[in-house]
């Protein structure tokens, strides 16, 4: 089964308020269907996922409107639900990273049991640059994927890495060199 993050006009930014429920329902459906043996997740357009919607954060709307307590509760109900749902998949998840995977996008990609990337991919956790904490589980997951020292460097400096570095560090298993932007990564 192939899942495509499909908001290319927003670089597949996440989440919209309904995304927690949508990811949970999709994962539940996969877990209930024994004919599905694997899920491949990729992004539409030129990005895997830009992560959080910075414009919504700045404008304090949608997930980010209201009091701190209201934002925290929505974050748990939406973002944490997405991460828990993906973590709870009972079939292998292949992250086919076709372009930038930043913040929440990097963390979701990191949940893949197998991670492959286009040579156009890049990875980063720019939370410090934005003055916010990484609250979606990535600070727990990233050290398990690339080791403590490298994870700390990325988390503390907000530096991004290219696909070749991600492969060297073990964040992705292999690179696929794309000659045509529409060629699927999972073939």
Spell out what each predicted region is.
Residues 15, 52, 58-61, 127, ...:
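Short, flexible helix/strand-to-coil boundary loops that buttress conserved ligand/catalytic motifs
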Residues 1-44:
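Conserved CoA-thioester-binding segment of acyl-CoA-metabolizing enzymes
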Residues 41, 53, 108-110, 166:
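Hydrophobic/aromatic residues within transmembrane alpha-helices
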Residues 159-164:
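Short, glycine/polar-rich helix-capping loops at beta-to-alpha or helix-loop-helix junctions
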Residues 82-88, 96, 102-156, 169:
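CoA-thioester-processing core
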Residues 10, 14-17, 43-82, 101:
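Glycine- (often His-adjacent) and acidic-residue-rich active-site loop
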Residues 176-187:
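Single conserved hydrophobic/aromatic residue that forms the stacking wall/gate
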């Amino acid at each position: 089964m192939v899942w495509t993050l499909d908001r290319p006009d927003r670089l597949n930014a996440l989440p919209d308020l309904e995304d927690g429920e949508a990811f949970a329902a999709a994962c539940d459906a996969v877990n209930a269907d024994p004919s599905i043996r694997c899920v491949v997740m990729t992004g539409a357009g030129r990005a895997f996922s830009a992560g959080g919607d910075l414009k919504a954060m700045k404008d304090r709307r949608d997930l980010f409107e209201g009091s701190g307590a209201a934002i925290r509760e929505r974050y748990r109900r939406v973002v944490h639900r997405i991460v828990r749902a993906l973590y709870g998949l009972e079939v292998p998840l292949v992250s086919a990273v076709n372009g930038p995977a930043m913040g929440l996008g990097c963390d979701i990609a990191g949940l893949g049991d197998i991670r492959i990337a286009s040579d156009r991919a890049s990875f980063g956790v720019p939370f410090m640059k934005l003055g916010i904490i990484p609250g979606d589980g990535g600070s727990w997951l990233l050290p398990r994927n690339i080791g403590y020292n490298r994870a700390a460097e990325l988390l503390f400096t907000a530096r991004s890495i290219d696909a070749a570095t991600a492969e060297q560090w073990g964040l992705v298993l292999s690179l696929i060199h794309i000659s045509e932007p529409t060629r699927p990564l999972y073939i």
